[in-house]
């Protein structure tokens, strides 16, 4: 009898435990506040004293992975942001709270040096040709105090040589007085020269296409799908209610190349629960900017509380997207209809994933998620004794396992009938070409589709204090509902960067001998704190 009661108790516990209790994303890096790899302690002290560096004013918003580097962007929303485009040397910093290294160097992060530097970067993209695409918005500040010392400019870097190989200034005809662009999608066709970039103008309500080969851009602006939904402008994140009702086209993802040689661009306005689509055949054609209304397709709504700012699609058609109202990351397999029953949640965390600002899939099908508590930063006050910013990672196969997006383990059907007009959506073929990449360190074993052990429960890697975060600390000085202007996604900066006469992205190591609690020259032995985690690194030599 007692055995039967015990079985019933276990069953009840299993029934009430949410499906995301066994966390799949694993925390790789975390910070109470961001730190930067200054050339030396004296220059850092000078920057702190002058206001060129104010640690509490830095918020990470974008992440991208390539080889042994993890790129992180920090917009110049407030004073004291020394660099906007940075990276982590993953060989030296396997976990913890590493200093951010300016990329490609300090001089290239000087705000206001329009021709030679990046003033503010948001989300960035590495393509399969080893190029890093960065849109410099040229702005400092946020909301009504935003200024534009520089024009919008596309900057492309060769990640093999760490040099800028292209700078293209968007012409005035492609922007308007309300323009704000924070997202980029890169479309590679038959070769590396057959490349296009697409930019979502969130507040100017347009979509800009740029051709690498032509070194030219054009704007699609005459479409209602770029505008916010007036019924979807109310947001609730981390116990804060706010309205971003003006936010239009924002997150974008690109499908694999289809049988006709083109991709599908999926996008959503931020103030919306709906996804839209258009073929890149239309976007690549400058002559279609004014007569393409009916080439855009409206898909279903995702359901309630499904605002999203970032999305990405794998080369086999699996889309991941952040769900900022739900502290979660969702998924959809593009071979299925775009309806709520075919949307899954791959992970959720009401502490660690508060505002998962960016989601990326790298060349090895590993997923990277950056969370930053942005609404708390903008509308209240962060507690800098708490962990505020985190970067998570996991293999894509692990994330979608046992979700509706894992078609190999589920018998869902029928195939998706939603397609771009005049085009057939056929199974995705092999890539047209491949390119060698630098090895990712540390290596992670591949997860089998056929059989995989349950993902480990999440135990946070030790931060500076070594304590597990159990709650979000938010200042009691919350913003009232009346008479308060909610900042948009972009306060004037009097100290706009540091112009150090140094060069080379690898000049300054991230681990200094004088730093307390750190080893010079890298970690000699590292085993994932979960004991059964993915990373196991033995320092050679």
Swiss-Prot record:
UniProt signal peptide: 1-21
Gene3D superfamilies given in the database record: TolB, C-terminal domain
Keywords in alphabetical order: Developmental protein, Glycoprotein, Secreted, Signal
Keyword ATP-binding found: no
Residues the record marks as carrying a glycan: 144
InterPro entries: 6-blade_b-propeller_TolB-like (IPR011042), Royal_jelly/protein_yellow (IPR017996)
One GO CC term, this protein: extracellular region
Family statement: Belongs to the major royal jelly protein family.
Record's function text: Controls the pigmentation pattern of the adult cuticle and larval mouth parts.
Protein name (Swiss-Prot/TrEMBL): Protein yellow
Taxonomic lineage of the native organism: Eukaryota, Metazoa, Ecdysozoa, Arthropoda, Hexapoda
